[in-house]
């Protein structure tokens, strides 16, 4: 691990919430030389960059336009990044917006594409091009093991086969009933975690880590929840949850 200012880090979903605060905390480390803010919206990315540079007191941030729900956008964004990247933080994701079970052009649900597919393209491209230096961190969720009291059932499968997991990717898992968006989210995060474990076996010289930030306040994830949960997230959870700056710390300490 570098001790001089030469470490480069790429963070997805870096213009707001956990991703932005991960960038802020990393910028306070003297060994951090460059932070790529991978964001899908230019205006929001520009505003985040200006705010982060003002707080850091040094111009170490670059914007990479990238929509992780679109593999083509991920490839295009990554093509604009020169050289290797020491650490990747795959933070972008969420509950899939207003149409989480709609299919993208690639045949995956928007839920799965947003949380997993784009990150698969990102990380495996870096690995294929031998451009990942040290570590990749995937933002998991407690939903991957179920949160019954919050309406997130524990993901379970009959066979755990590749074919069965593929039904989560294209949404056909719910073909015989009404989709359970909370369950679909947990399933997506679980598959992402299993994928990271696979990569850890394939590339023992690098570190592949899945980490849940916990019930962290200040994120955009609750925006797509059902109304009762949105209200609870806005007014109740800030009093019970982990402080906003504490959640990102679990990822920062791994880099």
Language-model-detected regions and their locations in the chain:
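C-terminal helical subdomain
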Residues: 234-255
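Rossmann-fold NAD(P)H-dependent dehydrogenase/reductase core
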Residues: 1-217
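Short coil/turn segments at secondary-structure junctions
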Residues: 179, 183, 231, 235-238
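A glycine/serine/threonine-rich, flexible loop-to-helix segment
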Residues: 152-155, 217-236
